[in-house]
């Protein structure tokens, strides 16, 4: 009789690494964690460092750190100087030449934060894909998170790439983002852009749907215990439904005349509306990067120029945009030394 003894198959370094990364632990790491955790740590660290210590005097002529007297709303990691163009501003590159102080002064922390932040967001999206695959879920969480990634990449990376330099990207700070929004309105008439309109409809529509859905579920909870309220009389492992879809359907059928009768379609709609809005606004920002125009109602502008008694909300907004451009350009781009004579500043009923 012959006895065959099988040899255990040798496992390579990849298999050992795979086992270690996917081990069940309090904070899952996974392959996506190799991208997520270092990039997120470095992006947040750079942002906290910049807002605490680094000035924007050499890039924007501004104070932007806690050290200079700013608060949480006015501190920022500001975009690099216009003269830097689209350089990645490596610490060891020709601009900084290994000098950390000079690197901070010319805006190196901004490119560092933007690029590591983008890869951190992508790593978080891949993390959702990876965990969903391991536990047998569909990947719709990761698909939904593509919306915020698209917005971040289009606003912070693609828009300035279409313009003259990183200088025209938003700074990483609350007031800095507000300044960027005013810039988009004045120089691109962003609020009249159809992609902006779709983005607003998606985000506000998603908030409305979320509120309606949550309220409807709360309204139709089953009285399934002695204390049947929102926080009691429910166990996470129970097999029974905790609210009545039938009652909810009857309620909204009476309110609107139509209602969702399929939970899967209902929740897909809740997913689709805000994500579609985020993607639409991202596409619009890419259009702005290429300096594509929004709606132009030239006939109204011509008539308003000829007839002082004719004015529309559109012509008022056009005048306001001219004002933003004229008064903002000199403040926003001090390195250009803009000087506007009074006769070129906008005048009209809107101002």
From Swiss-Prot:
Disulfide bonds: none annotated. The D1/D2 heterodimer binds P680, chlorophylls that are the primary electron donor of PSII, and subsequent electron acceptors. It shares a non-heme iron and each subunit binds pheophytin, quinone, additional chlorophylls, carotenoids and lipids. There is also a Cl(-1) ion associated with D1 and D2, which is required for oxygen evolution. The PSII complex binds additional chlorophylls, carotenoids and specific lipids. InterPro entries: D1/D2, Photo_II_D1/D2_sf, Photo_RC_L/M, Photo_RC_L/M_CS, PSII_PsbD/D2. GO terms for biological process: photosynthetic electron transport in photosystem II. Pheophytin a binds at residues 128, 141. Fe cation binds at residues 213, 267. GO terms for cellular component: chloroplast thylakoid membrane; photosystem II. Pfam families: Photo_RC. This is Photosystem II D2 protein. It comes from Cyanidioschyzon merolae (strain NIES-3377 / 10D) (Unicellular red alga). The gene is psbD.
């Amino acid at each position: 009789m012959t006895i065959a003894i099988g040899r255990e198959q040798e496992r390579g370094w990849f298999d050992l690494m795979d086992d270690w990364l996917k081990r069940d632990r309090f904070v899952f790491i996974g392959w996506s964690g190799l991208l997520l955790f270092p990039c997120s740590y470095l992006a947040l660290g750079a942002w906290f460092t910049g807002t605490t210590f680094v000035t924007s005097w050499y890039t924007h002529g501004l104070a932007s750190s806690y050290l200079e007297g700013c608060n949480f709303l006015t501190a920022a990691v500001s975009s690099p100087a216009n003269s830097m163009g689209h350089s990645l501003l490596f610490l060891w590159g020709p601009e900084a030449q290994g000098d950390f102080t000079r690197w901070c002064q010319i805006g190196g922390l901004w490119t560092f934060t933007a690029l590591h932040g983008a890869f951190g967001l992508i790593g978080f999206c891949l993390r959702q894909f990876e965990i969903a695959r391991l536990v047998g879920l569909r990947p719709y969480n990761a698909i939904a998170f593509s919306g915020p990634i698209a917005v971040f990449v289009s606003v912070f990376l693609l828009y300035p790439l279409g313009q003259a330099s990183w200088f025209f990207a938003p700074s990483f700070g609350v007031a800095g983002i507000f300044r960027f929004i005013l810039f988009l309105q004045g120089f691109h008439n962003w609020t009249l852009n159809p992609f902006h309109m779709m983005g607003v409809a998606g985000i506000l529509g998603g908030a409305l749907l979320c509120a309606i859905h949550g309220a409807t579920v709360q309204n139709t909870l089953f009285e399934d215990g002695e204390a049947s309220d929102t926080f009691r009389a429910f166990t996470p492992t129970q097999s029974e439904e905790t609210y009545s879809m039938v009652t909810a359907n009857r309620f909204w059928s009476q309110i609107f005349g139509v209602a969702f009768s399929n939970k899967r379609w209902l929740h897909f709609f809740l997913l689709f509306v805000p994500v579609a809005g985020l993607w639409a606004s991202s596409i619009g920002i890419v259009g702005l990067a290429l300096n594509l125009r929004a709606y132009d109602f030239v006939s109204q502008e011509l008539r308003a120029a000829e007839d002082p008694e004719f004015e529309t909300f559109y012509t008022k907004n056009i005048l306001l945009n001219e004002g933003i451009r004229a008064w903002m350009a000199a403040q926003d781009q001090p390195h250009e030394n803009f000087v506007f004579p009074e006769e070129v500043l906008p005048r009209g009923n809107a101002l």
